[in-house]
Every structure is written in C-alpha cells, then in structure tokens.
Amino acid sequence: MAEQVTSAKATAKTVRIPARKARLVIDLIRGKSVAEAFGILKFTPRSGAYLIEKVLKSAVANAENNFDLDVEDLYVSEAFVNEGPTLKRFRPRAKGSASPINKRTSHITVVVSVK
C-alpha cells in the first residue's frame, strides 16, 4: 500500500542574492500558513522577497499538481537558504592594483506540508 504524501518541495539554485540577505526574508515566513506567507512576502520591501515568493509559488504548485494536496491546508514547514557558488570579479584600482568583488549566490528551498 502506498504511503500518503503530505509535503511538497521547491528549490531555486544559484540565485543572485547573498544568502545573508535572503535569510532575513525567509525567517519571516517559516511556520506560517501559505496564504499568510504570500501576504507577508507581497508587502516585504526587501530584495529577496520576490525570489522567495516565486519559490513558494512553485512549492504550492508542486503540492497541488503532483500530490493532489489542498492548498488551503498547506503551511511552510521548512524554509532555508544555503550559500551557492561565489562569482569572483576584480575592480581595477589606483597604481595598477585591483580589489576583489565577490558576487554571492544562494540556494533557496521551501517545503510546504499539510497541517
């Protein structure tokens, strides 16, 4: 007998936002219902809110389409941000020197489950 699936997951890899900035937004939605999380993300003026909203939408769509879960009963059971690869660049400076510029990326993961 097949076990009933109660959660769905979505991941965005190598997103061009530092993990430190994305974590400030992801902490706001962890443990909230999906409807409340969308409301919070819509009115959060931080740079990562739009990207995290896209991942949350994808997780909800996965739950609905792949596992036939009811959207009204879903909540954000897990939400975390890991560091991705860093793009290393150099800015030319005075007297022939150069300063490093690290363009950081992150992996955003959101898991929604049935209450």
UniProtKB/Swiss-Prot annotation:
Q: Which GO terms describe its cellular component?
A: cytosolic large ribosomal subunit
Which InterPro entries does this UniProt record tie to the protein? Answer: Ribosomal_uL22 (IPR001063), Ribosomal_uL22_bac/chlpt-type (IPR005727), Ribosomal_uL22_bac/org-type (IPR047867), Ribosomal_uL22_CS (IPR018260), Ribosomal_uL22_sf (IPR036394)
Q: Would you kindly state one Gene Ontology biological process term found in this protein's UniProt entry?
A: translation
Domain of life of the organism in this record? Bacteria
Using the record for this protein, list the coiled-coil segments as residue ranges, or answer none. Answer: none
* Cited Pfam families: Ribosomal_L22
Q: Which GO terms describe its molecular function?
A: rRNA binding; structural constituent of ribosome
Q: State the PROSITE patterns in the record.
A: RIBOSOMAL_L22 (PS00464)
Q: Mind telling me which SUPFAM superfamilies this protein's record contains?
A: Ribosomal protein L22
Keywords from the named record: Ribonucleoprotein, Ribosomal protein, RNA-binding, rRNA-binding
| Record bears the keyword RNA-binding | yes
Summarize subunit and interaction data from the UniProt record for this chain: Part of the 50S ribosomal subunit.
Family as reported in the entry's similarity comment: Belongs to the universal ribosomal protein uL22 family.
Function recorded in the entry? This protein binds specifically to 23S rRNA; its binding is stimulated by other ribosomal proteins, e.g. L4, L17, and L20. It is important during the early stages of 50S assembly. It makes multiple contacts with different domains of the 23S rRNA in the assembled 50S subunit and ribosome. The globular domain of the protein is located near the polypeptide exit tunnel on the outside of the subunit, while an extended beta-hairpin is found that lines the wall of the exit tunnel in the center of the 70S ribosome.
Entry's HAMAP family? Ribosomal_uL22_B
Q: Name it.
A: Large ribosomal subunit protein uL22
Could you tell me which species this protein originates from?
Answer: Ligilactobacillus salivarius (strain UCC118) (Lactobacillus salivarius)
